[in-house]
């Protein structure tokens, strides 16, 4: 993901948590905040230490980033997203992972067609 598409600062994360709305499935929680003046979307990732060691957490973050890269043309611009991974996603294959992430986006109201 490009630098402009990332949320890194704590106050930006807190703004999405406090002012945004959330939706979830068993593997992910997605918070989203509308930013009409922003011409692109931004993604922040959160993977808790409860999920596993650093190797497992980094693998999950890489799979989320890869999924977002493949779906970037279908995600609405002008929004900030924070994706929180839950424990069940640690044992998933990439195909199951991507399908679950698409399902979580659809639950949050983002229309994504599964290619």
Swiss-Prot record:
EC identifiers of the protein: 3.1.26.5
MF GO annotations: 3'-tRNA processing endoribonuclease activity; ribonuclease P activity; tRNA binding
Keyword Nuclease in annotation: yes
Top EC group: hydrolase
GO (cellular component) term, any one: ribonuclease P complex
SUPFAM superfamilies on file: Ribosomal protein S5 domain 2-like
GO BP annotations, alphabetical order: tRNA 5'-leader removal
Family: Belongs to the RnpA family.
Role description: RNaseP catalyzes the removal of the 5'-leader sequence from pre-tRNA to produce the mature 5'-terminus. It can also cleave other RNA substrates such as 4.5S RNA. The protein component plays an auxiliary but essential role in vivo by binding to the 5'-leader sequence and broadening the substrate specificity of the ribozyme.
Summary of subunit composition and partner proteins: Consists of a catalytic RNA component (M1 or rnpB) and a protein subunit.
Full protein name: Ribonuclease P protein component
Source organism: Bacillus cytotoxicus (strain DSM 22905 / CIP 110041 / 391-98 / NVH 391-98)
């Amino acid at each position: 993901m490009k630098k402009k598409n990332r949320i890194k600062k704590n106050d930006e994360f807190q703004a999405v948590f406090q002012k945004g709305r959330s939706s979830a499935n068993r593997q992910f929680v997605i918070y989203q905040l509308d930013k009409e003046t922003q011409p692109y979307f931004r993604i922040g990732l959160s993977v808790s230490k409860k999920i596993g060691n650093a190797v497992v957490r980094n693998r999950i973050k890489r799979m989320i980033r890869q999924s977002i890269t493949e779906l970037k043309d279908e995600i609405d611009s002008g929004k900030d997203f924070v994706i929180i991974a839950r424990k069940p996603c640690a044992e998933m294959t990439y195909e199951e992972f991507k399908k679950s992430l698409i399902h979580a986006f659809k639950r949050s109201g983002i229309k994504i067609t599964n290619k």
